[in-house]
């Protein structure tokens, strides 16, 4: 496992963003682990999180001008990523959306840079894909071109069909990248000799995994 992935997992554990146990998901599935990026709320952890997103994004060599952060969790994620990119010499603009359209003042649903060029969505996870579809529509309606999606964790899990939501997105020609995925977690736990947790994650993937 590379240093970036292991460092990200350690940070997620330290901030209790990543927990192991028994967690009931919205789908009703009982998951042996849970990831909540909303618990990255200290300044230093947010700074590091932005750096992880920026590094993952630059490694993919995607051509882009804008970052889009879907409300609500995507807003600080995209902002932190833009700051990290600026520190690396890439001055990128940021846009995010409101949940409700504002009818007074500047009005509209978007805040930040106009979405008129190549755009990358920054989010924590993609489960059912609802937020992604809303973001995709907003980007298209405002003249943007969606070039890719960066998320923190790919659960490698299928939805209601045999395919994962990420697979369905990729079938549209849109690539989805993640800082880590389920198999990175399994490798990390193996290296830490946590074989009981490894077995639980592997058993869960046998039931609900997408390949």
Curated annotation (Swiss-Prot):
The keyword Transferase applies. Gene3D superfamilies: 3.40.50.2020. Orotate binds at residues 34-35, 127, 155. The keyword Magnesium applies. Pathway: Pyrimidine metabolism; UMP biosynthesis via de novo pathway; UMP from orotate: step 1/2. InterPro entries: OPRT, Or_phspho_trans_dom, PRibTrfase_dom, PRTase-like. Its cofactor is Mg(2+). It catalyses: orotidine 5'-phosphate + diphosphate = orotate + 5-phospho-alpha-D-ribose 1-diphosphate. Its EC number is 2.4.2.10. Pfam families: Pribosyltran (PF00156). One of its GO terms (cellular component) is cytoplasm. It comes from the Bacteria. Homodimer. Catalyzes the transfer of a ribosyl phosphate group from 5-phosphoribose 1-diphosphate to orotate, leading to the formation of orotidine monophosphate (OMP). This is Orotate phosphoribosyltransferase. It comes from Legionella pneumophila (strain Lens).
């Amino acid at each position: 496992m590379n240093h970036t992935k292991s460092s990200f997992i350690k940070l997620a554990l330290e901030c209790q963003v990543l927990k192991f146990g028994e967690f009931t998901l919205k789908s009703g599935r009982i998951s042996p682990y849970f990831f909540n990026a909303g618990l990255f709320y200290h300044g230093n952890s947010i700074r590091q999180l932005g750096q992880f997103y920026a590094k993952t994004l630059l490694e993919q060599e995607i051509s882009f001008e804008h970052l889009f952060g879907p409300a609500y969790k995507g807003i600080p994620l995209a902002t932190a990523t833009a700051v990290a990119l600026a520190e690396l010499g890439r001055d990128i603009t940021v846009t995010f959306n409101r949940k409700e359209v504002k009818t007074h003042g500047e009005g509209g649903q978007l805040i930040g840079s106009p979405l008129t060029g190549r755009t990358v969505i920054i989010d924590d996870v993609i489960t059912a894909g609802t937020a992604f579809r809303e973001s995709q529509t907003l980007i298209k309606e405002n003249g943007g071109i969606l070039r890719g999606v960066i998320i923190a964790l790919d659960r490698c899990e299928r939805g209601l069909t045999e395919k994962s939501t990420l697979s369905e997105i990729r079938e549209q020609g849109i690539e989805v990248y993640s800082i880590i995925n389920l198999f990175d977690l399994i490798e990390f736990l193996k290296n830490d000799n946590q074989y009981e947790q490894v077995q639980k994650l592997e058993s869960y993937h046998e039931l609900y995994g997408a390949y």
